[in-house]
Amino acid sequence: MSRSLRKGPYINVKLEKKILLMNESKKKSVVKTWARASMISPDFVGCTIAVHNGNKFIPVYITENMVGHKLGEFSPTRQFRGHAGNKKK
């Protein structure tokens, strides 16, 4: 279910502040965040954000196609090992 239009998108305040400061200074550096639920806004385009997946930080380069999605969508938390197969004798 999508978020109410009355509430607006959720963007972590600290993350947004770091991105705005980085855009003003025109220095491109990786920003670490644990805020996987934050929505990607147009201000984030061109930045690299390291999103925590529970174990390590996954660097995510933000493009225009990612606007409107959440940061956690681009940092998988589980590793698929494959289904069980037939054991050969």
Swiss-Prot record:
<dbReference type="InterPro" id="IPR023575">
    <property type="entry name" value="Ribosomal_uS19_SF"/>
</dbReference>
<dbReference type="GO" id="GO:0000028">
    <property type="term" value="P:ribosomal small subunit assembly"/>
</dbReference>
<comment type="similarity">
    <text>Belongs to the universal ribosomal protein uS19 family.</text>
</comment>
<comment type="function">
    <text>Protein S19 forms a complex with S13 that binds strongly to the 16S ribosomal RNA.</text>
</comment>
<keyword id="KW-0689">Ribosomal protein</keyword>
<dbReference type="GO" id="GO:0015935">
    <property type="term" value="C:small ribosomal subunit"/>
</dbReference>
<keyword id="KW-0687">Ribonucleoprotein</keyword>
<dbReference type="GO" id="GO:0006412">
    <property type="term" value="P:translation"/>
</dbReference>
<dbReference type="Pfam" id="PF00203">
    <property type="entry name" value="Ribosomal_S19"/>
</dbReference>
<keyword id="KW-0699">rRNA-binding</keyword>
<dbReference type="InterPro" id="IPR002222">
    <property type="entry name" value="Ribosomal_uS19"/>
</dbReference>
<dbReference type="InterPro" id="IPR020934">
    <property type="entry name" value="Ribosomal_uS19_CS"/>
</dbReference>
<dbReference type="GO" id="GO:0005737">
    <property type="term" value="C:cytoplasm"/>
</dbReference>
<dbReference type="GO" id="GO:0019843">
    <property type="term" value="F:rRNA binding"/>
</dbReference>
<keyword id="KW-0694">RNA-binding</keyword>
<protein>
    <recommendedName>
        <fullName>Small ribosomal subunit protein uS19</fullName>
    </recommendedName>
</protein>
<dbReference type="GO" id="GO:0003735">
    <property type="term" value="F:structural constituent of ribosome"/>
</dbReference>
<dbReference type="InterPro" id="IPR005732">
    <property type="entry name" value="Ribosomal_uS19_bac-type"/>
</dbReference>
